[in-house]
Curated annotation (Swiss-Prot):
Pfam families: Methyltransf_23 (PF13489). Coiled coil: none annotated. It comes from Vibrio vulnificus (strain YJ016). Keywords: Methyltransferase, S-adenosyl-L-methionine, Transferase, Ubiquinone biosynthesis. This is Ubiquinone biosynthesis O-methyltransferase. The keyword S-adenosyl-L-methionine applies. The lineage of its organism: Bacteria, Pseudomonadati, Pseudomonadota, Gammaproteobacteria, Vibrionales. NCBIfam families: UbiG.
Length: 235
């Protein structure tokens, strides 16, 4: 194992405390359920489908994205450091008859033993919750096969993202629990791409994720001011 784990105990506890409500479609994780079809479709389109491919979902939590990828025929491994979310994920997979594997580990430790193991790696809404996002990105690069795809999603750091993600989503609309995010840990696209460039991953595209509070819906678009997804490939 790595001597110093790239983990924030406060972040782990935050999601441990909410774990039992992970699959409540009207609970704290409602936004993840709402955006999941968009995330899944984006991954499917850029990775040319997932059927039969080995896929790693980093920071899988209760398994929302991991399960949906398994249902597309992927051989999925979900990775997380939260014990409670993983127990919820395993139980839900059992209840739905979805076949996939969940592992409690840091990505750094997993990468040390599984180099070039996966065709696709997803790391969604996770980088802003760890002390060293570059370490996570490097590990993702190590885990994916040459020619494979890695997807990162996170939040931009600017005034608009503070107003939307912190003031709006947490304080006013109560879409997510207050304290879920730390604006200082948000990552600008230029910063994320600079970190990606320090690996053998190549950025292939970037898209924004937009929330409409009037219709309570999300859509993908060009604007990356708040939430965004980056598609990379290993060459």
């Amino acid at each position: 194992m790595t001597k110093t784990q790239n983990v924030d105990p406060n972040e782990i506890k935050k999601f441990e405390d909410m774990a039992s409500r992970w699959w409540d479609l009207e609970g704290e994780f409602k936004p993840l359920h709402q955006i999941n079809p968009l995330r899944l479709d984006y991954v499917l389109s850029k990775a040319d489908g997932l059927f039969g491919k080995k896929v790693l979902d980093v920071g899988c939590g209760g398994g929302i994205l991991a399960e949906s990828m398994a249902k597309e025929g992927a051989v999925v491994t979900g990775l997380d450091m939260g014990k409670e979310p993983l127990e919820v994920a395993r139980l839900h997979a059992l209840e739905t008859g979805t076949k996939l594997t969940y592992i409690q580990s840091t990505i750094e430790d997993h990468a040390a033993e599984n180099a070039q193991m996966y065709d696709v790696v997803t790391c969604m809404e996770m980088l802003e919750h760890v002390p060293d996002p570059l370490s996570v990105i490097r590990s993702c690069a190590a885990l994916v096969k040459p020619g494979g795809h890695v997807f990162f999603s996170t939040l931009n750091r600017n005034i608009k993202s503070y107003l939307f993600a912190i003031v709006g989503a947490e304080k006013l609309l109560k879409i997510v629990p207050e304290g879920t995010h730390d604006h200082d840990k948000f990552i600008r696209p230029s910063e994320l791409i600079k970190m990606i460039d320090q690996t053998d991953l190549c950025e292939q595209g970037i898209t924004g994720l937009h929330y409409n509070p009037l219709s309570d819906t999300y859509k993908l678009g060009r604007n990356v001011d708040v939430n965004y997804i980056v598609h990379t490939q290993k060459f």
